Amino acid sequence: MAAAGATLHCRAMETMLLLLPDVAMVALGLLLSRGNGWDRRFWDGLEKLVYFVLFPALLFNSILKAPLSIGSAAPVMASAVAVVGAGIVLGWLAARVLKPDPVRFASGVQTAFRFNSYVAFALAQRIGGEAGLALCAMLAGIIVPMVNVAAVLALARNAGGGWWNAILRNPLVMATLGGMAGNALGLVLPEPVSASITRLGTAALATGLLTVGAGLVIKSEPAAGDRSTTSMTVWFTVVKLLLMPALAMLATTLVPMAPLERTILVMFAAMPTASTCYILATRMGGDGAYVARLVTLSMVASLATVPVWLALVR
């Protein structure tokens, strides 16, 4: 028992060291966003650049060049859908059990099942190289539209039109599907085009992590809330950081998977919630301040939980 505990501790420390460069980039983004004259408009513009240009370039290029077998990856992809589906259901249970403020619930429930893709892709690349990155991209290609639809449906009562089209035109989904199609067809890009896309993709992870740090809320006005709001905050955080990775661990024992697939699945499920939850909530008339606190709590708490989950699965 003592030996097993020592092994787990060593693996957790190894994972902490693996996470350290990404945590440092997030911390740098936080520092740069505070008091240096770069206002919110700068960071919003940078986030758009990452989301619409740099990140899609990274995904497309990684999947296009990776030795993929979509058929053999079907078990891990199906497991990811099941885990995220369970997270959506568990998140929605808070409305029935806690009877919280409807607007605050609709705004915050997305944090129980959405994931921070910038951190996920950065860590997947460090764990499994291009193969890990490509596998993570394949999972994201399925999960991104799934969680976006669930998040939008929760906020739909306050939303305007056009959101279904926005989901269908999601740049990350389009890049992933395009890369998978090109890979299946054996597409080889001309060298100048390939080099240009590679350079754009190289800038994606570091820039994306900087925007995550810039979006963290360290101090804000307290939300007008009650016990149900506090309970809901804990509920969403527990679902995202504890229950979803636990379900992913269970899936790895029930479904045959390669070692890298097991690791990426659990890592994917253990990720903190998406920093863009705040953007969606505010654009659809929700409680943006509450969501900003949820995002920050998830990011900070994940520094303790992610190393443990990865140590358990590796």
Model-derived features: positions:
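Alpha-helical transmembrane segments of multi-pass small-molecule/ion transporters
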Residues: 2-314
